[in-house]
Curated annotation (Swiss-Prot):
UniProt KW keywords: Cytoplasmic vesicle, Disulfide bond, Glycoprotein, Immunity, Inflammatory response, Innate immunity, Isopeptide bond, Leucine-rich repeat, Membrane, NAD, Receptor, Repeat, Signal, Transmembrane, Transmembrane helix, Ubl conjugation
Chain ranges for the short sequence motif ATG16L1-binding motif as given in the UniProt record: 761-778
PANTHER family tied to this protein: TOLL-LIKE RECEPTOR (PTHR24365), TOLL-LIKE RECEPTOR 2 (PTHR24365:SF17)
Record gene name: TLR2
Subunit structure, as described in the record: Interacts with LY96, TLR1 and TLR6 (via extracellular domain). TLR2 seems to exist in heterodimers with either TLR1 or TLR6 before stimulation by the ligand. The heterodimers form bigger oligomers in response to their corresponding ligands as well as further heterotypic associations with other receptors such as CD14 and/or CD36. Binds MYD88 (via TIR domain). Interacts with TICAM1. Interacts with CNPY3. Interacts with ATG16L1. Interacts with PPP1R11. Interacts with TICAM2. Interacts with TIRAP.
Predominant cellular place of this UniProt entry's protein: membrane
GO annotation (BP), single: positive regulation of non-canonical NF-kappaB signal transduction
Name of the protein this chain belongs to: Toll-like receptor 2
Covalent link location (Glycyl lysine isopeptide (Lys-Gly) (interchain with G-Cter in ubiquitin)): K754
């Protein structure tokens, strides 16, 4: 029994391991370039079977806890390894021994409490290393990075347990593009620990407290170009000149991000910055000022020289006691050399006139996402304010009148670039006043419905994108760039109004087509962006866009953003890939050809009808059918005549004086039906013919040249023809009054021609001795 249980347990373990292995393999996908992705796949270990084909391996956000020597042994060509946000607590000494080609290694946010230099010794090609967020207290007992001669980006430290920086920690590193140290809970800093690095382009330092800030500052000031301080409480910071000593500063930019500061500590920070002789740029992002702007120096403090600072950037500054804020008059003297100022999303509603007048060197001012209105802007742009200002950005404020805004800026004589986008102007007056040197104007997202002469003629760049424009007809003779995307325009602007245009961006409008002639009319155009419109892919448009090879050089978003909207069967397809059928592309020619063919068919039908009497056939058929459809007055009708005589009026003498006399005076007499005598007056002649033929036992045709030429004889012959065809009888008797060729009888009377070919007909003899026999034969034929 125990043996059986043991076997069951072993089998269960094997099955469990096989399932886990198959699950690991299923969570990893690799492409043909060796890029393998297995992030967020619930992996418990590094998948087996990895080969030298793998070049990039992403296993972030899994449950991996252990890396063995064999896991990555075959990945000799691996260049990037991402293992962030797992549960890794152990890495065997030689786990990375075969990764000589590795350039990018991310081990951040795991559970590595001890770091080993043996991990990194084989990584001679490493340029990026991230060890942030692991619970180590120090960076190991020996130097970790001394063998990483190609390292450019290094990130180390954590928020809670990293408490000590030692001199050996960064030994061997001479140049770094970026060094990020999370020393939020730093308690000990060994002097000159960071001084060993000769040059750092960008140092990011996370520190909750400022206790060790000056010591670190002394070490990095001569090697760091951009120093960024994050998440630091400087409310009680105090600068001591003795702590810095003589320094040869290399710092050009100092950034404070998510830093707390007071009026007094800001003054102390400025004293610190005064030690950086080459400082050019100062930036405050997401900072909190716990003060009211009272930056007055104490009697013991000397006046601060701002040095060479040219750029000041403030973004999302939070001032809890905003309503008590001062006028900044104590800082006026420090601003005269500043050339670029950005104060963004910081609730600025006014720049005092005196401050504006002190900003004598200011060339660029960005007050985006604030509370500026025309009345306060007028005070800010007072006489002699911002005398050197060239660019003013007032994006997303509370401006509402273009006319007032333009008039307010007239005092700025050197102003050339104005961005007042994302304000709500809605309408535009017919005329406005602007500074004389205006070259650039941004009116995007201002809800305007039309553009007028308010736009200055001196502009070289105009942005009116994302509005409600359906027409652009301004004459701007100097305009070089026009941005008018996301409007409602249905066609390209008139090129004659924009003779100098180089760049036109008109994507996502209501344009359905444009032609070669339109583009050629823009003589100087170099760049056109017209994608995202609802193009009608007509044959002309397709021919133009697909045959012009040079068009791709002008259309910067070709071909991806040029899609057909119609015809419906090509909707959504790229214009360059659409091919229309011949019938769609040559519809006019096709319709014309069909009309010509139809005309020729009708003409041919007419000729054939005329040649073969088709019209006559139809007329006779119609008359016969009409006659057949007439209701009978009696269910049956008796034969009233022995024969109906059809003859030509020119043969009337022979019929009336010879034939009638011989037949009607015979004993017993024959009763003949003659049209002159027996037709009912007032009745339709066709009806008379049909009725007479139907009431007659026989129909006698007196054939002669006159008969063939007679129209009424033709009718009588016609209806006799129909009767022969309809009733299939032999009621017709043919008399040849004079010799006549069978060809003289119209071919349309095929039945009668057949009778003449198959049956004997009577011929009027010229010899009087034979005429008695003729009458005997005729009487016999009528009686038969």
């Amino acid at each position: 029994m125990p043996h059986t249980l043991w076997m069951v347990w072993v089998l269960g373990v094997i099955i469990s391991l096989s399932k886990e292995e198959s699950s690991n393999q299923a969570s990893l996908s690799c492409d043909r370039n060796g890029i393998c992705k297995g992030s967020s796949g619930s992996l418990n270990s590094i998948p087996s079977g990895l080969t030298e084909a793998v070049k990039s391996l992403d296993l972030s956000n899994n449950r991996i806890t252990y890396i063995s020597n064999s896991d990555l042994q075959r990945c000799v060509n691996l260049q990037a390894l991402v293992l962030t946000s797992n549960g890794i607590n152990t890495i065997e000494e030689d786990s990375f021994s075969s990764l000589g080609s590795l350039e990018h290694l991310d081990l951040s946010y795991n559970y590595l409490s001890n770091l080993s230099s043996s991990w990194f010794k084989p990584l001679s090609s490493l340029t990026f290393l991230n060890l942030l967020g692991n619970p180590y207290k120090t960076l190991g007992e020996t130097s970790l990075f001394s063998h990483l001669t190609k390292l450019q980006i290094l990130r180390v430290g954590n928020m809670d347990t990293f408490t000590k920086i030692q001199r050996k920690d960064f030994a061997g590193l001479t140049f770094l593009e970026e060094l990020e140290i999370d020393a939020s809970d730093l308690q000990s800093y060994e002097p000159k620990s960071l001084k060993s690095i000769q040059n750092v382009s960008h140092l990011i330092l996370h520190m909750k407290q400022h206790i060790l800030l000056l010591e670190i500052f002394v070490d990095v000031t001569s090697s760091v170009e951009c120093l960024e301080l994050r998440d630091t409480d400087l409310d009680t910071f105090h600068f001591s000149e003795l702590s810095t000593g003589e320094t040869n500063s290399l710092i050009k930019k100092f950034t404070f991000r998510n830093v707390k500061i007071t009026d007094e500590s800001l003054f102390q920070v400025m004293k610190l910055l005064n030690q950086i002789s080459g400082l050019l740029e100062l930036e405050f992002d997401d900072c909190t000022l716990n003060g009211v702007g009272n930056f007055r120096a104490s009697d013991n403090d000397r006046v601060i020289d701002p040095g060479k600072v040219e750029t000041l950037t403030i973004r999302r500054l939070h001032i809890p006691r905003f309503y008590l804020f001062y006028d900044l008059s104590t800082l006026y003297s420090l601003t005269e050399r500043v050339k670029r100022i950005t104060v963004e999303n910081s609730k600025v509603f006014l720049v005092p006139c005196l401050l504006s007048q002190h900003l004598k060197s200011l060339e660029y001012l960005d007050l985006s996402e604030n509370l500026m209105v025309e009345e306060y802007l007028k005070n800010s742009a007072c006489e002699d304010a911002w005398p050197s200002l060239q660019t003013l950005i007032l994006r997303q404020n509370h401006l509402a009148s273009l006319e007032k805004t333009g008039e307010t800026l007239l005092t700025l004589k050197n102003l050339t670039n104005v961005d007042i986008s994302k304000n709500s102007f809605h309408s535009m007056p017919e005329t406005c006043q602007w500074p004389e040197k205006m070259k650039y104007l941004n009116l995007s997202s201002t809800r305007i419905h039309s553009v007028t002469g308010c736009i200055p003629k001196t502009l070289e760049i105009l942005d009116v994108s994302n509005n409600n424009l359906n027409l652009f007809s301004l004459n701007l003779p100097q305009l070089k760039e026009l941005y008018i995307s996301r409007n409602k325009l249905m066609t390209l602007p008139d090129a004659s109004l924009l003779p100098m245009l180089l760049v036109l961006k008109i994507s996502r409008n209501a344009i359905t087509t444009f032609s070669k002639e339109q583009l050629d009319s823009f003589h100087t155009l170099k760049t056109l962006e017209a994608g995202g419109n609802n193009f009608i892919c007509s044959c002309e448009f397709l021919s133009f866009t697909q045959e012009q090879q040079a068009l791709a050089k002008v259309l910067i978003d070709w071909p991806a953003n040029y899609l057909c909207d119609s015809p419906s069967h090509v909707r959504g397809q790229q214009v360059q890939d659409v091919r229309l059928s011949v019938s769609e592309c040559h519809r006019t020619a096709l319709v014309s050809g069909m009309c010509c063919a139809l005309f020729l068919l009708i003409l041919l039908t007419g000729v054939l009808c005329h040649r073969f009497h088709g019209l006559w056939y139809m007329k006779m058929m119609w008359a016969w059918l009409q006659a057949k459809r007439k209701p009978r007055k009696a269910p049956s009708r008796n034969i009233c005549y022995d024969a109906f005589v059809s003859y030509s009026e020119r043969d009337a003498y022979w019929v009336e004086n010879l034939m009638v006399q011989e037949l009607e005076n015979f004993n017993p007499p024959f009763k003949l039906c003659l049209h002159k005598r027996d037709f009912i007056p007032g009745k339709w002649i066709i009806d008379n013919i049909i009725d007479s033929i139907e009431k007659s036992h026989k129909t006698v045709f007196v054939l002669s040249e006159n008969f063939v030429k007679s129209e009424w004889c033709k009718y009588e012959l016609d209806f006799s023809h129909f009767r022969l065809f309809d009733e299939n009888n032999d009621a017709a008797i043919l008399i040849l009054l004079e010799p006549i060729e069978k060809k003289a009888i119209p071919q349309r009377f095929c039945k009668l021609r057949k009778i003449m070919n198959t049956k004997t007909y009577l011929e009027w003899p010229m010899d009087e001795a034979q005429r008695e026999g003729f009458w005997v034969n005729l009487r016999a034929a009528i009686k038969s």
